[in-house]
Amino acid sequence: VQWSESERTIINGIFSHLDYDDLGPKAFSRCLIVYPWTQRYFSSFGNLHNAEAIMGNANVAAHGIKVLHGLDLGLKHMDDIMGAYAELSSLHSEKLHVDPDNFKLLSDCIIIAVAAKLGNAFTPETQAAFHKFLAVVVSALGKQYH
């Protein structure tokens, strides 16, 4: 993947403004609520019976934070995102058996949460760069499925 200097600047700028403890739980909760079939991977998280329970679930919040910190790996290795996520791809495909389509669903929820947080600063150019970054991460996470 080729990154322009503008894309690199935009992506790094987005991450420099993120409050992982706030945004991670919001994005992950949204995914579990909007796409309830994704809940099947998280039965050990306890009560996920409705939106209120999901949004108040400490395990959901912790996993959302973990997911956002997982994106730091891609940020640090933008020139080798596929290689950087090889181990996580294996974990999700071989041990956890996660449907790779769910990575795209979660990335969409992350984009929505970031857009809500950045407001007018989430310009079309910003969205394009962030979407490209997440699409490459999603592809890397799904690599072991191919």
Curated annotation (Swiss-Prot):
Residues 2-146 form the Globin domain. One of its GO terms (cellular component) is haptoglobin-hemoglobin complex. It comes from the Eukaryota. Heme b binds at residues 63, 92. SUPFAM superfamilies: Globin-like. It holds the Pfam family Globin. Red blood cells. GO terms for biological process: hydrogen peroxide catabolic process. GO terms for molecular function: haptoglobin binding; heme binding; metal ion binding; organic acid binding; oxygen binding; oxygen carrier activity; peroxidase activity. Keywords: Heme, Iron, Metal-binding, Oxygen transport, Transport. Involved in oxygen transport from gills to the various peripheral tissues. Belongs to the globin family. Heterotetramer of two alpha chains and two beta chains. This is Hemoglobin subunit beta. It comes from Pogonophryne scotti (Saddleback plunderfish). The lineage of its organism: Eukaryota, Metazoa, Chordata, Craniata, Vertebrata.
